[in-house]
């Protein structure tokens, strides 16, 4: 076989390989950054069937809109703790009015049976709840119920490209973390500095809040449920396990993702944001998580410089720790908050 024939064969094989690699990599990039998201109705039906929406419809909720760093509008809702009205018991500030035009005067008394009491000299407690990839804020209601029982006021919102927000590409935590910083600032502007503020996120919501810690936001605690430490490792695992495709395609997909969506997968490393972090973190993760293995939480716990706890839940797949072990989850959450807040 002459050298010309060999060269032609090699060129043909290379062309065939590229004909496979490039389209598949593009499909992967599009799948990651433009995912099919769950509708409110489907999420509502799912959460209701699981029993997580009991009493939710009767709660008084204020719809809010918070402009992010790039002008993108984030939609969400505020649910104050039982017995609290914005016209009393919350430190006033110049930025009290909501960015959605609200005058901040709406009273919202809950009805969840919370028996927590707040003395006149105690700080009001707030938590920002961030849902996971492809879902919407209704996925946070199960955690909202826990915090309301402990006397917290809750802010839950839709990630960009999800829920009630305008459609746009997802950046797996990069822009989403900056969105969360805008929500944190909004809470402080409306309710003042003399409050306790925490973050509780699930999956990509967890990754977003971990990335936000790099900017040292004004928060007092973080609860990370099934978050990832490195996006690349998650995608490699999924490509191999779910689609039985070679892991190297993640690298080529990342190149195309950078071209089309302006970020590479290698940039999304929440673990790096913890190298100087001092905010206490509670890591929650299912031992049987097939999407983001629990070792991601263990790696982040080893990396953070602040106080940390890791709680692993038996027989729990991705984002199912609370659903599988509600009592244990609630007890661990309460103990963590008592330890770091008193």
Predicted regions located by residue number:
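An N-terminal hydrophobic leader/cap segment in hydrolases
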Residues: 8-67, 77
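The serine-hydrolase catalytic nucleophile loop
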Residues: 126, 132-146
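Alpha/beta-hydrolase active-site loop
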Residues: 170-191
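Alpha/beta-hydrolase fold nucleophile elbow
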Residues: 191-203
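Short beta-strand/loop motif that positions the catalytic acidic residue
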Residues: 276-278, 283-285, 289
